[in-house]
Amino acid sequence: TFSGLSKSHMIAGFRIGWMILSGAKERAKGYIEGIKMLSSMRLCSNVPAQAIVQTALGGYQSVAEYVKPGGRVYEQRECIYNALKDIPGISVVKPHAAFYIFPKLDVEKFNITDDEQFALDFLHEKQVLLVPGKGFNWGAPDHFRVVYLPNVLQLEKAIGKLKDFLAAYKQK
């Protein structure tokens, strides 16, 4: 069994996870030894984050208040979705089970042939980082990803900068 706290407890980025092996461990002895060797050579434990595991697993387990209307994550998602759908040249689907949104750009309107260049142009001009779709194995240069965990004011500011940027953007 594999599990983690990143999504269930809204601490994305901390990469706190675990693996539980049950049953006849003798059959998995080589696998277990390989995991032990790999973890002792290549992995560095996130000691500060490990301190929250016991509290997280032993405490209140619901995120319902965050994802219902009025909740922080709900309001952040609504903010980013509504702001993006109102920008000419962007189409977007509202996410239902993620902390990010994956908008589509009208590549003809903006003359986009390289989504990485688009992200770099936006970063250089407006100092806001977007992740190009190719970073998630998206084949066409027409998507980018935005995590909507920052507070609503930060999201509004960033999307305002994107709207201003796209008003005059044509990729060279």
Name each region found by the language model:
Residues 1-71, 81-82, 166:
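Conserved core segment of the aminotransferase class I/II
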Residues 54, 70-84, 92-106, 140:
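Conserved glycine-rich beta-strand-loop-beta hairpin in the small C-terminal domain of fold type I
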